[in-house]
């Protein structure tokens, strides 16, 4: 019997059809539009997202050799996807990368709310989290709040359209309203945010044992899916990607190479000491995902390519591969986002720098320094993460560069594995569906059977020693630059935050 998995990303919807043995039988993609009606805003039309999903699902269903017996869904997390009592959107979805609630986050940081909330939820607050968006809407669009009956995420919205039932997966709910240890809504968090009134908006919380619902007749008609098949609400995308990469037991690690570099470690305990990064339930019983999503990732490489007159990151990697191992002394600190950096330390004033330039440095040396600087953030996040992983699974568009894969192995000192599946998030949702519907007994068994490794890159130990010295330089340069980050902003430099030692 075949099955379907939906992975609804921010800019692309992906739907994959699977055979029983895990072979990908069909893949359909649909672009989705992010609108920015004002500076810092990021929204999506909820009806358009569902229409794109339904269309892609129907295309896959029509290409399968037999009718699918299950559909699993994962999607982008956070944001606010508000609906009324009839399940109709009360406005556009406010996305995870929306920045309109900066004032709310600044106030919570200043008043100590963010630090206390982290001890309960395990996640650092950001402007695109539901609490910040709700606080902004309550102040600026109270009519919309009054018309809303349920606060959903993208995955919850798609689950509602597929089943008629509003719900949220625990991983999606982990931040900002859930007590990560009790795995339930926290009244104290609502009090801290001053959002007691919003408690009524929270939908049913679905844990690992309650993921399965039945597809509605209307959704079956829209998508071409068979009536009565199970719908599985899988963990949201960063968790599903970890599962799809085979990271399902404590101590395993993965990194998603995208616009952000999300370095993730699986744990069996919750650590809420240094308020940085996020901790969410993985979707695997008894396991948590400790994630460090940086602001310094693929967009920095895009910037570097443009700076050097190149047309793509592929060209940047090719140029960097020709650079000398010592990069002619050039060093790069990659904090280029106007929002600063959020992992493995939090500082909204963080800025990048290119240092050590000389007449001996060529374009290839600068290209290599740029790539190495970005790669150092992966090591920095692993250093801040709990445990000591023995390998690192990589996924995302960056895995197409053989040079970068070898560099990551050498910088981290870990064997790097590349999953055979290009649609890792969808595979993670499918694996969740197999376990949830009893087709596989548990996640380790499911991953062992259905996650294949396409390539493994072993670290060069001599190169790792050299990069360890360079990592120490990276940390020293960062601390030396801190006073410059705030000089032009009239601020006092913050105390050095966690994120790695030598």
Region locations from a protein language model:
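N-terminal glycine/serine-rich phosphate-binding loop of ATP-dependent small-molecule kinases
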Residues: 1-91, 119, 147, 220-221, ...
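Active-site core segments that coordinate phosphate-bearing ligands/cofactors
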Residues: 4-6, 109-121, 132-167, 177-192, ...
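Structural signal for short hydrophobic segments within the conserved structured cores
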Residues: 26-30, 203, 455
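Short, acidic/turn-prone active-site loops that include or flank metal/cofactor-
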Residues: 30, 35, 94-101, 172-174, ...
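Short beta-strand-loop/turn "lid" adjacent to the catalytic site in phosphate-handling enzymes
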Residues: 62-96, 124-128, 155, 159-179, ...
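Pocket-flanking alpha-helical
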Residues: 82, 103-107, 241-243
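A conserved helix-loop-beta module that forms one wall/lid of the active-site cleft
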Residues: 194-207
